[in-house]
């Protein structure tokens, strides 16, 4: 039973880490996947239980407030605070919209901004965009199509004091 539980955990971890096995290319990972003893019912349950009802609401509200630039086929969404995986879920969904080739989804926490970047065009490397957005004010990185990062609010305000104060004034007037 312990080996089956461990096999189930390893199988599901590999499933999630390889984008549902679509990015499974390492022969060792492939061999492990084929040799694991796992609970298929548990895997099915895990696959279909990825977010809570609250996270669904956060994602839905965020997607209603999408900012889109038609010239660059680029979208930006500001989300309520949530797990970084939900930011990725929103980004993945947004990239499925016709005409959206690159997107950034972000939210604020007590010390800064978490963000998720997606791109499906060769002209925009998600990891490079993530690095660019956080350069000198946080950290970012990932893969060619999917990346993420964090921006320190303190470092952002120090580097861009005018932008921050203008944004704060604009935001205050909107309320």
Model-identified regions with their sequence ranges:
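Glycine-rich, small/acidic residue-mixed loop/short-helix segments
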Residues: 141
């Amino acid at each position: 039973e312990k080996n089956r539980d461990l096999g189930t955990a390893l199988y599901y971890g590999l499933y999630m880490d390889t984008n549902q096995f679509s990015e499974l290319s390492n022969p060792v990972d492939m061999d492990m996947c084929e040799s694991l003893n796992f609970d298929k019912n548990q895997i099915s349950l895990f696959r279909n239980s990825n977010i809570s009802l609250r996270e669904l609401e956060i994602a839905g509200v965020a997607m209603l407030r999408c900012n889109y630039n038609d010239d660059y086929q680029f979208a930006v969404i500001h989300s309520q605070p949530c797990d970084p995986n939900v930011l990725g879920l929103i980004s993945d969904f947004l990239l499925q919209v016709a005409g959206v080739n690159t997107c950034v989804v972000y939210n604020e926490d007590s010390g800064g901004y978490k963000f998720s970047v997606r791109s499906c065009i060769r002209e925009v490397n998600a990891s490079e965009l993530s690095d660019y957005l956080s350069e000198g004010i946080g950290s970012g990185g990932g893969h060619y199509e999917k990346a993420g990062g964090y921006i320190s609010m303190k470092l952002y305000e120090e580097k861009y004091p005018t932008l921050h104060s203008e944004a704060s004034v604009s935001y205050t007037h909107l309320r």
